[in-house]
A protein has these predicted regions:
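Bacterial Sec-exported substrate-binding components of ABC uptake systems
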Residues: 2-12, 25-72, 175-210, 327-334
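Bacterial N-terminal signal peptides
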Residues: 14-22
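Short helix-initiation/N-cap motifs at beta->coil->alpha
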Residues: 46-51, 104-115, 243-251
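A short, structured surface patch at a secondary-structure boundary
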Residues: 62-120, 124-130, 238
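Short secondary-structure boundary segments
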Residues: 67, 129-130, 154, 263, ...
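Alpha-helical, coiled-coil/dimerization segments enriched in small aliphatic residues
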Residues: 89-96, 219-248
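Proline-aspartate-enriched helix->loop->beta-strand connector
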Residues: 113-127, 252-267
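Extracytoplasmic substrate-binding proteins
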Residues: 138-214, 240, 301-334
């Protein structure tokens, strides 16, 4: 699952060097200035060791999102009319955003070809790092056509947490001239999270293991966003702090056994485009493994289903944390 993403994350995080480009916004003359003082919104990204500086003075009008997560981020900010297309839908769209999503042109089930991408005259692109690699459309080809590229920091850093995600939403809002709307959304998410945490403050913390898939040994979360958001609801990833400085990677069942999690959180791809086992099949696979029978989570049948989009950066995190908190701690949160 995340194996495809890890290589490009490394590329994006390589030390900045070589040429620096500045790309101006390509919005139409009728697009309002982003800031009252007319100053550009700026940011930088690094691709294959080359730093690129981007700047937009007017909000983009032909944006393309190359991942479901960034698509939902844009839709949450009401930017569907600024989107020329979307791609790589991995599961069902977040229900509150379905109507907005239906207004956006779908360019491809996965990544579009360069020709299809350019056919909608994009002036802005966003998505997971892989979207701008040789696996999809290399960043340099977009940059050559003066397409601004923005990568959420929460999708890059092994230190990313919910605050990183919130900052990404605010930056996206700033780029599109809707910063106040982004800030309002963030404030609402903070309020909801505070209510969740108030219900949990006197409860003991639980130990969890995140099971994505396996090939003899489990593919799991170690550090980064998934681990850090679970901490917010009193759930500690048993694979964190073991010296593996990666977000997702292959682990070992021996380590899981030694760590003895109370719950196993299972990524369910049953309705996605990924070729993985669904939730029930994964449970049966775990239960049929003789060496796992003494793990507390297995003995007590503590398996929790999640969708990938619920435990990775995007707009669903706080809603997912509410449900996960209820299941992990056995409480009802209004």
């Amino acid at each position: 699952m995340f194996q495809k993403l890890r290589k490009s994350k490394k590329l994006v995080l390589i030390a900045m060097a070589c040429a620096t480009f500045a790309i101006a916004g390509c919005g139409s003359d009728t697009t309002k200035s982003i800031a009252d003082n007319g100053k550009s919104v700026t940011w930088s990204e690094t691709f294959d060791g080359t730093k690129t500086d981007f700047a937009v003075k007017s909000s983009p009008t032909h944006a393309v999102s190359m991942s479901q997560a960034t698509t939902e981020m844009m839709l949450q900010l009401g930017l569907e009319d600024k989107m020329a297309g979307t791609a790589f839908k991995e599961e069902e769209i977040y229900p509150p955003l379905q109507a907005a999503y239906d207004k956006v042109k779908v360019l491809s089930d996965k990544w579009p070809s360069y020709e299809v991408f350019m056919s909608v005259k994009p002036d802005f692109a966003t998505g997971w790092p892989d979207s701008f690699s040789k696996r999809a459309i290399p960043a340099d080809k977009m940059i050559a056509q003066k397409v601004n590229i923005w990568l959420p920091e929460s999708m890059l850093s092994t230190k990313a947490d919910l605050e990183t995600n919130f900052n990404d939403m605010i930056k996206l809002g700033e780029i599109f001239g809707v910063k106040s709307k982004a800030e309002e959304w963030v404030a609402g998410q903070r309020k909801t999270l505070e209510a969740i945490q108030a219900k949990l403050k006197d409860l003991p913390r639980k130990r969890v293991f995140i099971y994505d898939s396996e090939d003899g040994q489990p593919f799991t979360a170690f550090e980064g966003y998934t681990t850090n958001i679970l901490k917010l609801i009193g759930a500690d990833n048993v694979m964190s702090g073991l010296g593996v400085d990666k977000t997702w990677a292959k682990g070992s069942w021996e380590t899981v056994i030694a760590q003895n999690p109370d719950y196993i959180i299972i990524a369910d791809y049953g309705t996605s485009i990924r070729n993985d086992d669904d939730f029930q099949q994964k449970i049966e696979k775990i239960k049929s493994n003789p060496q796992l029978q003494d793990i507390t989570a297995v003995k007590e049948g503590h398996f929790i289903r999640v969708k990938l989009s619920e435990i990775t950066p995007g707009v669903r995190t706080v809603d997912a944390l509410k449900r996960l908190a209820e299941e992990i701690h056995g409480v009802k949160i209004d």
